[in-house]
Amino acid sequence: MTATAQQLEFLKNSIKSIQDYPKPGILFRDVTSLLEDPKAYALSIELLVERYKNAGITKVVGTEARGFLFGAPVALGLGVGFVPVRKPRKLPRETIAETYELEYGTDQLEIHVDAIKPGDNVLVVDDLLATGGTIEATVKLIRRLGGKVTDAAFIINLFDLGGEQRLEKQGITCYSLVPFPGH
């Protein structure tokens, strides 16, 4: 099943836009409204599974926290394992960490050292692509463990914030279901 224009418009219409959140001048795209509609949620998962079902994916990685909501069901649909990437001190076993830049400071992500095996073909899934910093850090973690990652999938791409171009420089092909301008 290839996504039709009608299906993609349905998904776009299921995402509410909130003006001046979290601060004045921002138009926030709220993917949780898509989750509230079981038809929209199911369709988003079906379309991602369909796109990657023959790609030889061996693991799906989702980044905290909304990446879990889309990554885990995509992994189930592909019949592969799901690996969470989390904020510091949230994973119980041995981890490695990657620090990345934020607008004002830094943050860090962690992954279990035994979650990705050398040669794993990994798909990264998240709810939204903005500047690409979080996904770039996630990709670095996967590659440090010997995983191969060439693709990242998103529900929303805020296309004018430069995330897709940033990730392309890292050899990542980005796919998103719903494009929006970023604010």
Swiss-Prot record:
<protein>
    <recommendedName>
        <fullName>Adenine phosphoribosyltransferase</fullName>
        <ecNumber>2.4.2.7</ecNumber>
    </recommendedName>
</protein>
<dbReference type="GO" id="GO:0044209">
    <property type="term" value="P:AMP salvage"/>
</dbReference>
<keyword id="KW-0660">Purine salvage</keyword>
<keyword id="KW-0328">Glycosyltransferase</keyword>
<comment type="function">
    <text>Catalyzes a salvage reaction resulting in the formation of AMP, that is energically less costly than de novo synthesis.</text>
</comment>
<comment type="pathway">
    <text>Purine metabolism; AMP biosynthesis via salvage pathway; AMP from adenine: step 1/1.</text>
</comment>
<dbReference type="Pfam" id="PF00156">
    <property type="entry name" value="Pribosyltran"/>
</dbReference>
<keyword id="KW-0808">Transferase</keyword>
<dbReference type="InterPro" id="IPR000836">
    <property type="entry name" value="PRibTrfase_dom"/>
</dbReference>
<dbReference type="GO" id="GO:0003999">
    <property type="term" value="F:adenine phosphoribosyltransferase activity"/>
</dbReference>
<dbReference type="InterPro" id="IPR005764">
    <property type="entry name" value="Ade_phspho_trans"/>
</dbReference>
<dbReference type="GO" id="GO:0005829">
    <property type="term" value="C:cytosol"/>
</dbReference>
<keyword id="KW-0963">Cytoplasm</keyword>
<comment type="similarity">
    <text>Belongs to the purine/pyrimidine phosphoribosyltransferase family.</text>
</comment>
<dbReference type="InterPro" id="IPR029057">
    <property type="entry name" value="PRTase-like"/>
</dbReference>
<dbReference type="GO" id="GO:0006168">
    <property type="term" value="P:adenine salvage"/>
</dbReference>
<dbReference type="GO" id="GO:0006166">
    <property type="term" value="P:purine ribonucleoside salvage"/>
</dbReference>
<comment type="subunit">
    <text>Homodimer.</text>
</comment>
<dbReference type="InterPro" id="IPR050120">
    <property type="entry name" value="Adenine_PRTase"/>
</dbReference>
